[in-house]
């Protein structure tokens, strides 16, 4: 991690900071060119072991372990630890997360009152994330310097960066780590439910997916946040984020308001509005009144509207509507 310049009484002083320089951006990882040029035999062996074509194996390596950027003009950088472990074991595992438990990170997220969805698509200037962690005013320096988020875009005109989770390995691992703090101590039950929900959505069965979700939430212990509508939004965000082939975002801006949750699958785009102690019809009416569907008319996929109403006393879904 980055640290402040030491005092004039220290032997180590006047350090040159190279952490955001383009000419050093690929020094701490493996670029795609290095992967293809130096590890071709490893790729072929992995593909054969997994029953994949060479191109499919490369695509899965990129999906799982690529995506790091360390400067405004940075090559895509693979996580070297996970990449080498994958080649060694010939399996697409979550190796980086298996090497340690992010307990400190979770505690700091609570301290700074960071919600799980707050980690996605963060806009910041350089001083807000490339900064010493000992006196950080936000959690961004810790998230960035420990590898949980990375640079995904840079706006040169306005000099700000967009930060996000780098890849599937980090996304799934971090989401699983957040489950005990935000949903239930039973992480296995949550991941199994997410897997069954994914199977339903693959068949475009949102009705079955919501029934599974309701059954699952009926097993979750009561917590004090169930009277807060945003709590249910975060629960849905965590569970849907475990659906690894889906893009999930919350509080998505439209010309007429903000959609609670937007989820993009291979076949559909889902607009999800969450209400508490009202009814699903009210949620659906808001989607129509604010004309949320128009915002996504050019996405190229059928748009499905989903209104969900939660009962705060039960801490569970009361009813829903799907169109």
Residue ranges: model-predicted function:
Residues 276-293:
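Mg2+/Mn2+-dependent nuclease catalytic core
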Residues 295, 299-323:
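Domain-level recognition of nuclease-like catalytic cores that cleave nucleotide substrates
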């Amino acid at each position: 991690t980055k640290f402040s310049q030491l005092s004039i009484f220290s032997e180590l002083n006047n350090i040159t900071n190279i952490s955001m320089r383009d000419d050093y951006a690929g020094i701490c990882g493996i670029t795609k060119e290095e992967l293809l040029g130096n590890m071709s035999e490893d790729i072929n062996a992995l593909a054969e072991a997994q029953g994949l074509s060479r191109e499919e194996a490369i695509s899965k390596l990129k999906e799982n372990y690529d995506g790091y950027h360390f400067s405004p003009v940075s090559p895509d950088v693979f996580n070297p630890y996970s990449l080498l472990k994958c080649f060694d074991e010939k399996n697409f595992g979550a190796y980086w997360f298996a090497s340690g438990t992010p307990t400190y990170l979770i505690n700091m997220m609570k301290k700074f009152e960071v919600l799980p969805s707050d980690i996605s698509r963060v806009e910041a200037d350089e001083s807000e994330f490339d900064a010493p962690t000992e006196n950080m005013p936000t959690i961004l320096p810790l998230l960035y310097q420990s590898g949980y988020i990375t640079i995904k875009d840079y706006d040169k005109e306005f000099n700000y960066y967009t930060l996000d989770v780098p890849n599937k390995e980090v996304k799934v691992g971090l989401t699983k780590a957040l489950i005990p703090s935000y949903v239930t101590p039973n992480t296995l039950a949550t991941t199994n439910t997410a897997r069954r929900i994914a199977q339903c959505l693959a068949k475009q069965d949102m009705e079955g997916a919501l029934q599974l979700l309701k059954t699952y939430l009926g097993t979750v212990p009561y917590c004090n946040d169930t009277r807060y509508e945003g709590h249910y939004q975060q629960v849905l965000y965590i569970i849907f984020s475990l659906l690894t082939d889906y893009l999930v975002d919350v509080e998505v801006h439209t010309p007429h308001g903000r959609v609670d949750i937007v989820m993009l699958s291979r076949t559909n785009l889902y607009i999800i509005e969450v209400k508490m102690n009202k009814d699903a019809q009210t949620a659906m009416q808001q989607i129509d009144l604010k004309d949320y569907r128009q915002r996504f008319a050019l996405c190229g996929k059928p748009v499905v509207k989903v209104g969900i109403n939660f009962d705060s006393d039960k801490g569970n879904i009361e009813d829903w509507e799907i169109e």
